[in-house]
């Protein structure tokens, strides 16, 4: 719908966001209007990115190195997914980039589950196991 970033065409919000072609109910625009759907997808992406950064900063405070590493991987996956989403938009969503973006979402979900598991069930470490 809008192969531009960060703006959507000329503005932040698409001008015809609530237009439904057959004059149907306005609520259908949330599912049928490509501009509004893309806007909502972008806003969800920004929200996930901001929340992910907060979670990463909190996860970095763990005393367990493997938990920290899991949150680092989460932040890296989040960054790659955002960049991939922006590139997909700028290239007008070719199939290979769209599929890569969807695969990135699955990978990001997996990294979230892994980081959460590491935070809830950290691998205990001992000073005796450390090599000098």
Features from the language model and the residues they span:
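Polytopic transmembrane helical bundles with strong interfacial aromatic enrichment
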Residues: 1-132
């Amino acid at each position: 719908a809008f192969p531009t970033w960060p703006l959507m065409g000329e503005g932040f919000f698409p001008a015809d966001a609530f237009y439904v072609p057959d004059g149907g109910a306005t609520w259908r625009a949330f599912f049928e209007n490509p501009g509004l759907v893309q806007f909502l997808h972008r806003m969800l992406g920004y929200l996930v990115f901001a929340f992910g950064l907060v979670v990463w900063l909190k996860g970095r405070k763990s005393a367990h190195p493997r938990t920290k590493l899991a949150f680092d991987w989460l932040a890296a996956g989040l960054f790659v997914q955002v960049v991939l989403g922006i590139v997909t938009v700028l290239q007008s969503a070719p199939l290979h980039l769209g599929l890569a973006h969807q695969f990135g979402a699955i990978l990001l979900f997996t990294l979230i589950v892994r980081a959460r598991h590491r935070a809830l069930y950290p691998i205990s470490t001992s000073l005796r196991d450390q090599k000098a």
